[in-house]
């Protein structure tokens, strides 16, 4: 055992062993055995616990002789098969033999283990050498990897540097190209200058427009980059060249336009100066066809200018071209237009002149717009472009119409002019959405405004003279004879039909004039203007009718005056109903009355004139107050009509049942006096008597009262209804007006009947013989 321990302790320390052990431990931990596997290992360990001797061990053969112990041992140690044979005689020899045998066996076993240890040591050494070589190889690989990484890093750095250099090269090339392209704009100055100042350069040259375009590009670029060195100097020089080029264009256009105008005038004179050629059509007229052909070379230049109209320089030159064009066109057509309008004024009346003149100007404007569109297609929708041409032409018509309008006093003719301008002329333009005629619209609207102003003035004068200040004649106030002599045909609501024109003869003239005037003005004037005129007309017409009613009362009867007023107010109310306006006007006026008290305080020394800090200072109270008052002519008309109807109803009621009303009033007074508890005993004794014993209420008096009322119903009410029918042709109107009269009559009879039943006996009631309420209502209904 000592030898074995010594052998094991003599094993060298090896990295292979530790690494193998660590690997085995890791393996054991990483791959634990199951219980079944562990049981199998235990079984195997028990099975191999007692190993048999190796085949090369010594085989012993023990022979027992007859006279002693014989032992034969065969040793095969290290391949030697020698035999140890000994004859054991005594114990001592046996012990000696056994000791030798034990030593031989131990020696043999130790030799085997030594050989195994030696072999294991060699293997361990070999493994250590291999591990050492592997470590050295790994170190070499690590060093090689580090060197590779270094080479890779250097290579990547080199590649990055190359890429950076390529990018810098590309940027420098792009910068150089950009710098070259930017410098080209500055370098163009010399090229453009030499071309523009060349004696052979003119607008008709094929290189002129490309040079102008390049010049504009240079100016735009320098304007967008003012930070460049000497940019202001170059910009100034480029602008000078641009001004020169635009001046050349202006001169060229003016020369071509004048040449074209001269050719047209020469051709026009060659035709004998026919003044009517301007109205014969666009394509056939020498003024348009020749001018278009003569000036056709301007079209490319004008199109270039219009395409650059976003720049202010070209806006100015384009406006100048428009002006030059309009001047030349005006010089050609103004004489013809003026002559034609003058011919219209000499031959035609004002409405026909307005219609013909507007139609002629519309035709001329249409042709001029077509020609203008040929040269300036992009500017054709701008109304102001042709204004220098259209305004003078339309002024010729305006100058001829205005003096005639100022002196025109006929409202019908002025209304006709409004219709012509608003419907036939301006309305026709709006319907067609005609751009060529848009330039004529301001002048037409100006003429229409003058006509409206004149019409408004004449309408106010007419209202003042013919309605408000109307002086009626005896024939105008001859009512009811005027109604009795006319056919009773229509009602108040059917007065606008032509077949009922005779009914106007029964009207009071201011009413007919008011309605006629308003019906004419309604479609002609603006709503605000018409509202003011309508309110004024209705107000003064109502006052005029009221004045006439008072005069009729003096000439005829009160009832005639009332019915006259009711009739005409009803007609006026019904006839103004279709006008979709408010007959109210708000009047504003300044009120300085509040300053009086403040001035008094200043004069008394109680306030200061220049005390700016106080609210009572004159400066603070100097501003006037604005007072607003609203006048509604329609409401005033309704109020007057209602008052007149109530007066008529009460007058008829009193005329028929006045005795009954007086009787009821006296009875009521007696009852009130008795209920008030007066102190006059003498009077109380008189009033305390029964009603039928009163002097005014005896049965005979009541009989007389009833007969008097019944006679009034028969004799007075029927003529009143006949007169109502004469004044008021509409049955529904008469029914509405008679209904409260009937109600009042029935109410008076009802009150008297109640008193009779309460105060008189049945015999007395029979003697009085008062008509029943039902019979009375039937009788009154039959009157209608």
From Swiss-Prot:
Record-linked SUPFAM superfamilies: Cullin repeat-like
Protein topology in the membrane: Peripheral membrane protein
GO MF entries: protein homodimerization activity
Keyword Transport recorded: yes
InterPro entries for this protein: COG3_C, COG3_N, COG_su3, Cullin_repeat-like_dom_sf
Keyword line: Golgi apparatus, Membrane, Protein transport, Transport
Subcellular location: Golgi apparatus membrane
Protein name: Conserved oligomeric Golgi complex subunit 3
Organism: Arabidopsis thaliana (Mouse-ear cress)
